Amino acid sequence: MLLSKITFFERFEHDILSGTKTITLRDEAESHVITGQILPVSTFETDRWFCDIQIIDVTPVKLTELTEVHAKQENMTLPQLCDVIAEIYPGLEQLFMIRFRILSQ
């Protein structure tokens, strides 16, 4: 079943709105989106809407395959990105990279 919305931690809101965060790494349960799909974006903590995004593509990627390029697309260093992934998805190796663009407000 396709996702009907997507949430991000509040700490990522500014990076998304400024266009410096252009991907999100998710587990399989949160990877069910398709190219071209438009999703409302809300904060995880309070479910407050703050923008809409359009999905560019979805690509499987293993934790061990993450590079500085992925980190830059997340607006982080690679060690920061690996720490965040370990915090959110402890022990998970298989991720899905969802590339997106923010739609005009």
Swiss-Prot record:
The lineage of its organism: Bacteria, Pseudomonadati, Pseudomonadota, Gammaproteobacteria, Alteromonadales. One of its GO terms (cellular component) is cytosol. It catalyses: N(4)-acetylcytidine + H2O = cytidine + acetate + H(+); N(4)-acetyl-2'-deoxycytidine + H2O = 2'-deoxycytidine + acetate + H(+); N(4)-acetylcytosine + H2O = cytosine + acetate + H(+). GO terms for molecular function: hydrolase activity, acting on carbon-nitrogen (but not peptide) bonds, in linear amidines; N4-acetylcytidine amidohydrolase activity. Residues 7-93 form the ASCH domain. Pfam families: ASCH. Belongs to the N(4)-acetylcytidine amidohydrolase family. The active site is at 21 (proton acceptor), 24 (nucleophile), 74 (proton donor). This is N(4)-acetylcytidine amidohydrolase.
